[in-house]
Amino acid sequence: MKSWTAAVLSLGLIYLSISQNEGATTEFPTMNYEGRCALDMFTLIEVGDTFNYRHACLSYTCMKRDETFYVQVHTCDAPHFENVTSGMICNFTPPTTGNFPDCCLKVNCIAHLNHTSAN
């Protein structure tokens, strides 16, 4: 019984590691807690990565333009750009107020010391 359980757990871990590496799109869950957006997460931004947020009309795309890296932020209103470096870690923080689907997230980027190349 123990070996069967270990085999199932091993297969589950392999599946998780494979599924996390598929494609460049990552979805993160959001919650509506007392009428506010609840999402506070650090994630590694790579060039070409797109982040889609379920239950909120937001997406972030890391892109390169004129040798400068940006995170393109699509909100309910209009897209705008946040200047970032390849391999930066972005902290997605909920606004102080806002209900679905009108909530928009702030993006704060900090340097990732082990991932500084701009290739």
UniProtKB/Swiss-Prot annotation:
**PTMs per UniProt:** Contains 4 disulfide bonds.
Checking InterPro entries in the record gives: SVWC_dom (IPR029277)
Expression tissues:
Expressed by the venom gland.
What are the UniProt keywords, alphabetically?
Answer: Disulfide bond, Secreted, Signal, Toxin
**Which positions, given as ranges, span the membrane?**
none
The protein's superkingdom reads: Eukaryota
Q: Which residues form the signal peptide?
A: 1-19
Tell where it localizes: Secreted
Q: One GO CC annotation, please?
A: extracellular region
MF terms (GO), sorted A to Z: toxin activity
Question: What does the similarity note say?
Answer: Belongs to the scoloptoxin-16 family.
- State the protein's name: U-scoloptoxin(16)-Er11a
